[in-house]
Amino acid sequence: MQPHETFTGSYQPGDVEFLLKPVVIEMTPVDQKEELIQSGKKHYSDMLSQEPAPTQWHLDLFHRALDRGAERLAKEVTQLAISLAERFGDEPIVLASLVRAGVPLGVMLHQALRDMGKTSWHYGISIIRDRGIDGAALDVIEERHGTSGIVFVDGWTGKGAITGELVRALKDRPGYPEQPR
């Protein structure tokens, strides 16, 4: 991966560094995209569809869910940060969030760890079902920090396809446990 300007997207500098290569891709209408995926003509990762802006109904739903769940989320993020801090002791923690679902949780964990005085770094990296993880991004993280403090963060587990990709991707890379952290 070439040296690059730090990209943080809509997050604050210091919350996450995305190790992604910018690409330009033509938008595919959702119905056409679904047809191409179902027919096997294209992989889901080869296409993007324009996402509409959230409606007021969606925004209201989000705010109601946030109001109901914020306290629990804060408690659980704090518990996870404490567990990581205890597990790693004085060793810095390197959060490798799987884009996109892992990044919001990774940002919250990174902030919680910093608030506890724990040294941590946070990266957003790509992993795609049936295609694997971005090896160049892992190379950058490993070169900067080694492998012993890396913790992978995902915010969506679904049926486990991405977990399987992660296990397969790390199997032949030295320094990782059999089951990723």
PLM features per residue range, with description:
Residues 1-181:
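PRPP-associated nucleotide enzymes
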